[in-house]
Swiss-Prot record:
Residues covered by the CMP/dCMP-type deaminase domain: 2-120
Protein name: tRNA-specific adenosine deaminase
CDD domains, per the entry: nucleoside_deaminase
Source organism (scientific name): Bacillus subtilis (strain 168)
EC numbers, comma separated: 3.5.4.33
C-alpha cells in the first residue's frame, strides 16, 4: 500500500462517519510531514450550512490546530474531487498537494470540469494526484445515492397510495 493509499483510507473512514449521519459520504484528512493534522467529513445536512464540505472543515481544523492560515507543506486527501469552493480554499490556504479518490463529473474543479488548483493566474498552485482508491471512493458515493433514490421513490409511492 502506498502512502497516498494509506492516507486515503483515513479519508474513507471519515466518509463513513458522514454516511452514518445521513450525509453524502465524503471525508478528508490533512497531512503535514507524515502526521495527520486534521480530519473531517461532510456535515452540510447536519449543520444546514452550504460550506460544511469535508475539505472546508478539514482546512479550518488544520488552521486552528497550527495557529496559521498558511498550510504550506500540507497534503489534503479527500475522497471526492474538490468543488469550486473547496478548490478555492485549497489555493487560498496554500495547501501544497491534493490527492483525491473519485472524479466529480458535475462539480470537479481539480481537472474534470476545470482545474482551479493549477490555474497559473493564481499566486499559488497545488500539485494534484487523482484517482487514488477511486473505485472504493466512487463506490461509496454510488451506493449512497442509489439508496437515497430508492428511499425517495418509496416515499413518493407511499404518498400516492
Amino acid at each position: 500500500m502506498t502512502q497516498d493509499e494509506l492516507y486515503m483510507k483515513e479519508a474513507i473512514k471519515e466518509a463513513k462517519k458522514a454516511e452514518e449521519k445521513g450525509e453524502v459520504p465524503i471525508g478528508a484528512v490533512l497531512v503535514i510531514n507524515g502526521e495527520i493534522i486534521a480530519r473531517a467529513h461532510n456535515l452540510r445536512e447536519t449543520e444546514q450550512r452550504s460550506i460544511a464540505h469535508a475539505e472546508m472543515l478539514v482546512i479550518d481544523e488544520a488552521c486552528k490546530a497550527l495557529g496559521t492560515w498558511r498550510l504550506e507543506g500540507a497534503t489534503l486527501y479527500v475522497t471526492l474531487e474538490p468543488c469550486p469552493m473547496c478548490a478555492g480554499a485549497v489555493v487560498l490556504s496554500r495547501v501544497e498537494k491534493v490527492v483525491f479518490g473519485a472524479f466529480d463529473p458535475k462539480g470537479g474543479c481539480s481537472g474534470t470540469l476545470m482545474n482551479l488548483l493549477q490555474e497559473e493566474r493564481f499566486n499559488h498552485q497545488a500539485e494534484v494526484v487523482s484517482g487514488v482508491l477511486e473505485e472504493e471512493c466512487g463506490g461509496m458515493l454510488s451506493a449512497f445515492f442509489r439508496e437515497l433514490r430508492k428511499k425517495k421513490k418509496a416515499a413518493r409511492k407511499n404518498l400516492s397510495e
